[in-house]
Amino acid sequence: MLNIRFALVRSLLFGTFLLPGCEDHELEENFFKQPPADRVERLRRYPLTDQYKIFRYGNDRKEPPFMDLAEPIAEKGATAVPFLVEQLNSESHDIAVRDILLIFATMASSKSYDVKSDSVLMSALSSKVSAMKDKDWKDICSKMLQRIRDSG
């Protein structure tokens, strides 16, 4: 009987205090369990919010990072910009800023959106890059931002 009480208390503690803090990455993990050959194509079939979650997971938690997963999001061009700006404004972590900047750099290079002509967006990106804490990421992102400015 004591073991049952202990198990019940333990499960209540874990359920009450630990589970809410755990992040659920089932969507992302299932995506990466599938064959790698058609990942980019498969990602195109997901809605933007899920594409973004999978992209971030593949960039931040996988080695080597799956930077090519920026392509399906970048292909959406102007339709993805409001969502990405919302993500940019809600994130302060250097890695999130880097990931979002990578999508915009992919948009610029693929010409799916004229990033450099969007002065409000460029100002927001510049501000976020300037505020980055990690010097190495800040340098890398500054170069990425300059490539966007130089894109033609």
State what each model feature region is.
Residues 1-11:
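Bacterial N-terminal signal peptides that target proteins for export
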Residues 13-16:
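Hydrophobic membrane-insertion alpha-helices, especially the h-region
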